């Protein structure tokens, strides 16, 4: 008996313990719903979730309330009816009244304070995506701002690249604007990764994403948006995207109808609010709107939200030890520690079997991959004409009726026929001259005799840095202006031309030393909307092509180097330039060596003396002076009148010398013409790889233009970094300044576009281009991205190439060669070339005059010596005769003869005495009074 009792007690205890161990964990889920009917649906959805998961460990329990009339009552109800039940999550639907935005807010604030996750069911307002305000809010529907993804995809499908974004200046409008701009920027960043290498192809396309031409905002509740819509009407875009409340949308529709902006050519893309309620009454036919599929189906969202919570609860309880949620709000300020973890599990959930489709959340807790119906208002009724499946738009174009009753897709833009053209002063492509006093342009003619086509262009009268700038009307003409006139006539548009304000082509520069970069020059004006088109010698490069559209190149070119031409200067010794000084010395030495050899050969040869017969005396052999005269005469090809060598050996040498002289003279004559007439090739730059460029020094300065495509090219090329560092210190503000610096010898080399430099070299004969072209590219017309004119401009340029118009422009403006015509003229010698020869003749005359005086002086001196010797011989003879007479015993000499002898001896004695006293004085025989009387009979007799 006692044993039976013990067994019974043991069985009872074991059963009680087993029941305690088998009881599932109760997980309460709260809900704030619209009606009692939806509360019943909520309980059924919870029961279905329990059955679906079939877990004996977890049991979901439904706790719900309905909406309260105000926020305070709603917050109290959440605390008293839901949080007090220790709910793990709260589901909340949007209030049934469309203008009541407060009911989800108190639920989100109250539950968020304790970090209890809140799942919105039909709440679409974008404010709930802000996690700094709504900490624990998730939702199974996307916000209104996510409609921007559908608009963006429709723009891509229909190739609408020009849009106007019209938004209300509230949180909803700003959120839609921000999301759309983010999508546009993402597409833009992807397109920038393209490699634009084949710029020569017309098919190099820029399939960019759409871009908002303008964003127009208006205050919520405004009653007059006419001025705003008039501004939109002046733009090119005809695709208008509207994000506004129902009442604001109705205001916009009424104003648009009055401005005739709802007819043919326009496209209106709107969201769900803009085709609901009061807005639908004023919406124009043809408008395209969106409707979220199951967006207002509260029952479907209840089922999906419960399924997501149930899946997350099971996942959380199986992996983590969780704490219990807070019980009530009174006196409880502690947050639920497991709440943030549970929220992360919910956000990472992927519920594939939802009634509304696949349920996933993004980082803001908003629904991803929502499906939309694309609606078209036709005859005041909304007709579905396509769907958005979460990633792509699938339209049914045959069912769409566009504004104005059109069935063909509008192109989405209107082409303005009045274009603002920006250009830059760059000869020969654009000349800039002041206007006449009456405001007109001076009439001029081209080299072909045709009148020059000029247009009025406004711009600064001086673009040099630091100078005052005044915008004045000026006259522009040249290659690009003729091209602009041709394009305007072909494509039927008008234009107004202005010069770029800062005088630059365009490059990116930092703003206020920040990381932000902006374009300057013509690029900046085009991107900022100050210009519609750039018609100038703008080089096509990758950096610019990422931001603007380029047409087909109208001029192909590259980079080259401009240097100053070394003009040869004729010197007095220019006639000696054909031979080096060493050769001249050898020739001179040869002349004298040959002369000496001729003299010696003729002197020592037995046949060096010549006589006709034996009775005649032999002629003297060749003297040294005659040999010199012969040697020089043969060399200078002058006639030899006398003094020719007599011996056979000397004549052999003379013939060899004549051959030598012929070769020397012929070589000299040939080279003399080249040196006196033709330019000698100087040492120029060989190209970009020249050592003087690759190894820069302060002795050789080269540069380009600041903030130009050439500057960008050298900055981007790593292998040219050394050159760029040298150039950066010497770059000029404009090409004209740099070219003038080359002419003034302030700059040794200027690197720039070949078309410009070759033109300058052809017009300024002291300049020359050198080296081969490098960095080949082309000049193109610049337009904003996806400009409606791009294709037409490129086609027109292609036709101009085909029909020879571009060739004619080249001949008229670029290939006109002034210096070439001068260089092709026959070369003539000038006085400068032959001045040295005349100076040589003058030197010969001076030398001859100098030598004649020396000869005269020498002759007089020689004659005096000879006469002195004659007197001496006469005196000796007289003395000898007298001596003989004495020895023979003859009488005394005649007294007259004695007197004569005394006179002669006295004269000789005084002459020798004076000669010893002064060597430089010449003396002559004198008589007793100081003058020798040669007419004296006795003297003449003695002599």
UniProtKB/Swiss-Prot annotation:
The chain crosses the membrane at residues 581-601, 652-668, 834-854. Disulfide bonds join 79-329, 441-475, 457-476, 765-819. Glycans are attached at residues 61, 224, 260, 297, 321, 371, 389, 461, 492, 512, 695, 792. GO terms for cellular component: neuron projection; NMDA selective glutamate receptor complex; plasma membrane; postsynaptic density membrane; postsynaptic membrane; synapse. The modification Phosphoserine is found at residues 910-911, 917-918. It is found in: Cell membrane; Postsynaptic cell membrane; Postsynaptic density membrane; Synaptic cell membrane. Glycine binds at residues 537, 539, 544, 709, 753. Residues 1-20 form the signal peptide. GO terms for biological process: calcium ion transmembrane transport; chemical synaptic transmission; ionotropic glutamate receptor signaling pathway; protein heterotetramerization; regulation of membrane potential; regulation of synaptic plasticity; sodium ion transmembrane transport. NMDA is probably regulated by C-terminal phosphorylation of an isoform of GRIN1 by PKC. Its phosphorylated state is influenced by the formation of the NMDAR-PPP2CB complex and the NMDAR channel activity. One of its GO terms (molecular function) is signaling receptor activity. Residues 624-645 are annotated as: Pore-forming. It comes from the Eukaryota. Residues 21-580, 669-833 are extracellular. It catalyses: Ca(2+)(in) = Ca(2+)(out); Na(+)(in) = Na(+)(out); K(+)(in) = K(+)(out). It is a multi-pass membrane protein. Residues 602-623, 646-651, 855-943 are cytoplasmic. Pfam families: ANF_receptor, Lig_chan, Lig_chan-Glu_bd. SUPFAM superfamilies: Periplasmic binding protein-like I, Periplasmic binding protein-like II, Voltage-gated potassium channels. SMART domains: Lig_chan-Glu_bd, PBPe. PANTHER family: IONOTROPIC GLUTAMATE RECEPTOR. Component of N-methyl-D-aspartate (NMDA) receptors (NMDARs) that function as heterotetrameric, ligand-gated cation channels with high calcium permeability and voltage-dependent block by Mg(2+). NMDARs participate in synaptic plasticity for learning and memory formation by contributing to the long-term potentiation (LTP). Channel activation requires binding of the neurotransmitter L-glutamate to the GluN2 subunit, glycine or D-serine binding to the GluN1 subunit, plus membrane depolarization to eliminate channel inhibition by Mg(2+). A hydrophobic region that gives rise to the prediction of a transmembrane span does not cross the membrane, but is part of a discontinuously helical region that dips into the membrane and is probably part of the pore and of the selectivity filter. This is Glutamate receptor ionotropic, NMDA 1. The gene is GRIN1.
């Amino acid at each position: 008996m006692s044993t039976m009792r013990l067994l019974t007690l043991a069985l009872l205890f074991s059963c009680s313990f087993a029941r305690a161990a088998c009881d599932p964990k109760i997980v309460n889920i709260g809900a704030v719903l619209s009606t009692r009917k939806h509360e019943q649906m909520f309980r059924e959805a919870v029961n279905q979730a329990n059955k679906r998961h079939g877990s004996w460990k977890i049991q979901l329990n439904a706790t719900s309330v309905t909406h309260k009339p105000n926020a305070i009552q709603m917050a109290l109800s959440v605390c008293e009816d839901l949080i007090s039940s220790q709910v793990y999550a709260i589901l909340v639907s949007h209030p049934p009244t469309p203008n009541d935005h407060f009911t989800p807010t108190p639920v989100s604030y109250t539950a968020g304070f304790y970090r209890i996750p809140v799942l919105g069911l039909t709440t679409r307002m974008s404010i709930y995506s802000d996690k700094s305000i709504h900490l624990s809010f998730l939702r199974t529907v996307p916000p209104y701002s996510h409609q921007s993804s559908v608009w963006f995809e429709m723009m891509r499908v229909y190739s609408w690249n020009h849009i106007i974004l019209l938004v209300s200046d509230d949180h909803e409008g700003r959120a839609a604007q921000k999301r759309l701009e983010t999508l546009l920027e993402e597409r833009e960043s992807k397109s920038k990764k393209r490699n634009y290498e084949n710029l020569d192809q017309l098919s190099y396309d820029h399939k960019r994403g759409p871009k908002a031409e303008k964003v127009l905002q208006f205050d919520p509740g405004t009653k007059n948006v006419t001025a705003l819509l008039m501004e939109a009407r002046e733009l090119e875009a005809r695709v208008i995207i509207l994000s506004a409340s129902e009442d604001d949308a109705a205001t916009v529709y009424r104003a648009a109808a009055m401005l005739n902006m709802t007819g043919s050519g326009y496209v209106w893309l709107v969201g769900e609010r803009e085709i609901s309620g009061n807005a639908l009454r004023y919406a124009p036919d043809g408008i395209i709107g969106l409707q979220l599929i199951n967006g207002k189906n509260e029952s479907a969202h209840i089922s999906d939200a419960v399924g997501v919570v149930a899946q997350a609860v099971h996942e959380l309880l199986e992996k983590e030890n969780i704490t219990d949620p807070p019980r009530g709000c009174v006196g409880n300020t502690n947050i639920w520690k497991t709440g943030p973890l549970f929220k992360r599990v919910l956000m990472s959930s992927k519920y594939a079997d939802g009634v509304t489709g696949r349920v996933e959340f993004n980082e803001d807790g908003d629904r991803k991959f929502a499906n939309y119906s694309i609606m078209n208002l036709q005859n005041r009724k909304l007709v579905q004409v396509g769907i958005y499946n979460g990633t792509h738009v699938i339209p049914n174009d045959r069912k769409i009726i566009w504004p104005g009753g059109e069935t063909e897709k509008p192109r989405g833009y209107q082409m303005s026929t009045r274009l603002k053209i920006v250009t830059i002063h760059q000869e020969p492509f654009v000349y800039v001259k002041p206007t006449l006093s009456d405001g007109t342009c001076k009439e001029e003619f081209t080299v072909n005799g045709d009148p020059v086509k000029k247009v009025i262009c406004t711009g600064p009268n001086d673009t040099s840095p630091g100078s005052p700038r005044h915008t004045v009307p000026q006259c522009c003409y040249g290659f690009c202006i003729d091209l602009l006139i041709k394009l305007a006539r072909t494509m039927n548009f008008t234009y107004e031309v202005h010069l770029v304000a800062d005088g630059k082509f365009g490059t990116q520069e930092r703003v206020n030393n920040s990381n932000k970069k902006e374009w300057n020059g013509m690029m900046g004006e085009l991107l900022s909307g100050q210009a519609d088109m750039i018609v100038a010698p703008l080089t096509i490069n990758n950096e610019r092509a990422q931001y603007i559209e380029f047409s087909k190149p109208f001029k192909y070119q590259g980079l080259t180097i401009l240097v100053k031409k070394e003009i040869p200067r004729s010197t007095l010794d220019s006639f000696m330039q054909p031979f080096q000084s060493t050769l001249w010395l050898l020739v001179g030495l040869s002349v004298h060596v040959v002369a000496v050899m001729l003299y010696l050969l003729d002197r020592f040869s037995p046949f060096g003396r010549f006589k006709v017969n034996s009775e005649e005396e032999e002629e003297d052999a060749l003297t040294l002076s005659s040999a010199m005269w012969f040697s020089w005469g043969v060399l200078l090809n002058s006639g030899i009148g006398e003094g020719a060598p007599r011996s056979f050996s000397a004549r052999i040498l003379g013939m060899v010398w004549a051959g030598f002289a012929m070769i020397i003279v012929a070589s000299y004559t040939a080279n003399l013409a080249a040196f006196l007439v033709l330019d000698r090739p100087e040492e120029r730059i060989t190209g970009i790889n020249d050592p003087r460029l690759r190894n820069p020094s302060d002795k050789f300065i080269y540069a380009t233009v600041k903030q130009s495509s050439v500057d960008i090219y050298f900055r981007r090329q790593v292998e040219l970094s050394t050159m760029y560092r040298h150039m950066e210190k010497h770059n000029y503000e404009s090409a004209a300044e740099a070219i003038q610096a080359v002419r003034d010898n302030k700059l040794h080399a200027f690197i720039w576009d070949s078309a410009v430099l070759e033109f300058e070299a052809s017009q300024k004969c002291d300049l020359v281009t050198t080296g081969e072209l490098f960095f080949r590219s082309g000049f193109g017309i610049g337009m904003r991205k996806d400009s409606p004119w791009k294709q037409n401009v490129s086609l027109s340029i292609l036709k101009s190439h085909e029909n020879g118009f571009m060739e004619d422009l080249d001949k008229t403006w670029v290939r006109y060669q002034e210096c070439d015509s001068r260089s092709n003229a026959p070369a003539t010698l000038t006085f400068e070339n032959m001045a040295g020869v005349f100076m040589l003749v003058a030197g010969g005359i001076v030398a001859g005059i100098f030598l004649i005086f020396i000869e005269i002086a020498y002759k007089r001196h020689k004659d005096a010596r000879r006469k002195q010797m004659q007197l001496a011989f006469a005196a000796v003879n007289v003395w000898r005769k007298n001596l003989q007479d004495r020895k023979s015993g003859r009488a005394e000499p005649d007294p007259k003869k004695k007197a004569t002898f005394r006179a002669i001896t006295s004269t000789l004695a005084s002459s020798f005495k004076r000669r010893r006293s002064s060597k430089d004085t010449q003396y002559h025989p004198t008589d007793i009074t100081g003058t020798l009387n040669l007419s004296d009979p006795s003297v003449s007799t003695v002599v």
